[in-house]
Regions:
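A short core secondary-structure module
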Residues: 140, 149, 153-198
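Short Ser/Thr-interspersed hydrophobic loop/turn segments at strand-loop and sheet-helix junctions
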Residues: 54, 77-82, 172, 188-193, ...
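Glycine-rich beta->alpha junctions and the first turn(s) of the following alpha-helix
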Residues: 3-7, 11-12, 196-296
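Short secondary-structure junction/hinge motifs that connect adjacent elements
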Residues: 27-50
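Buried hydrophobic positions in well-ordered alpha/beta secondary-structure cores of metabolic enzymes
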Residues: 9, 20, 54, 61, ...
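Glycine-rich phosphate/pyrophosphate-binding beta-alpha loops
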Residues: 132, 157-162, 206, 244-247
Length: 296
């Protein structure tokens, strides 16, 4: 089965396919054998190539220095990147469109534009022990205004990429006052006093981005680090969720295609009696089912 992509999407597909096949795939085994780590010079090279292509700004508006790509173009990019292990494809951060809509000029200067230029990395501290996707009802981290600062207290789980990040997006609820229980989102520098690393759980993957658990102990966050206004936090988090989950789905499709290709190649090469296991209908059925499910 095939379908025609618009010219721009096809150009991106070919460009990223070349990047994956010529630069990334060759490092897969080493990355898988070393918890996602590869030599620093190779990692720097991959990051530079991604930055030179403009990938950190694929969703950022053109007038802000980004590429302003369509969602289809972005999905095609992430589908191709999905054909290699995340240990290698996650070689750049993203400055997304919603950030330019939500953030002040000072925040854009200090946090978002450095993402766009590939100078900083971010992570998201949203999830808690009682909140996964139920961000609205399960957030217990509080933010209480005290003069020119908000005081944050709580605990955050599965903060993916925290070990390599420069700053965090932190979700909380107003702890008291007229806006009590309304959601807020903050920028938090990782070296802020009171940010305590509790643990870094091991997952069954092989990339170098860890999933820290943090405790927030009376952290003082400047009012200027509030994104938008009190009550805006949830809609901005949902903006990130929508974009991220679409691209995760695209990446999974790319991974599935790669897996089917690898399985097919193996079946054609694996000897069995006078032929290969690809001669067996049972194997053919499984591969055909996999292709059908992918295209469905």
């Amino acid at each position: 089965m095939s379908y025609d992509l618009p010219k721009s999407a096809l150009e991106w597909k070919n460009k990223i396919h070349s990047f994956v096949q010529n630069e990334l795939v060759q490092w897969e085994i080493e990355a898988e054998m070393n918890s996602g780590e590869i030599p620093t010079e190779a990692s720097i090279k991959h990051r530079k190539i991604a930055i030179d292509m403009g990938l950190p700004g694929m969703d950022a508006p053109k007038e802000k220095g980004g590429l302003g790509l369509s969602m289809l173009d972005q999905a095609v990019i992430w589908e191709e990147l999905g054909k290699v292990t995340n240990a290698l494809s996650w070689c750049f951060s993203e400055a997304q469109n919603w950030m330019y809509e939500a953030c002040s000029e000072e925040q854009i200067k200090n946090y978002i534009n450095p993402l766009l230029r590939g100078e900083k990395k971010e992570c998201y501290a949203i999830t808690e022990s009682e909140s996964g996707s139920n961000v609205d009802g399960g957030i217990n981290t509080t933010a209480i205004l005290d003069g020119d600062f908000y005081i944050l207290n709580g605990e955050k789980w599965y903060v993916t990429g925290a070990n390599k990040a420069d700053f965090l997006f932190v979700q909380a609820k107003i702890g008291k006052g007229k806006n009590k229980d309304k959601h807020v989102l903050f920028f938090l520098d990782k070296d802020t006093k009171g940010l305590e690393l509790l643990s870094s759980p091991l997952f069954s993957h092989t990339y170098s981005f860890h999933h820290h658990t943090y405790k927030l102990n009376n952290i003082k966050v400047p009012v200027k680090n509030l994104i938008g206004k009190e009550g805006d936090g949830l809609k901005y988090t949902y903006s990130w969720f929508r974009h991220e989950r679409l691209m995760i789905a695209a990446r999974c499709c790319g991974a599935s295609e790669r897996l089917i290709e690898e399985a097919t190649t193996f079946a054609k090469e694996r000897k069995s009696k006078d032929g290969t296991i690809s001669d067996y209908q049972a194997i053919q059925f499984m591969l055909a089912d996999s292709v059908t499910e992918l295209w469905a």
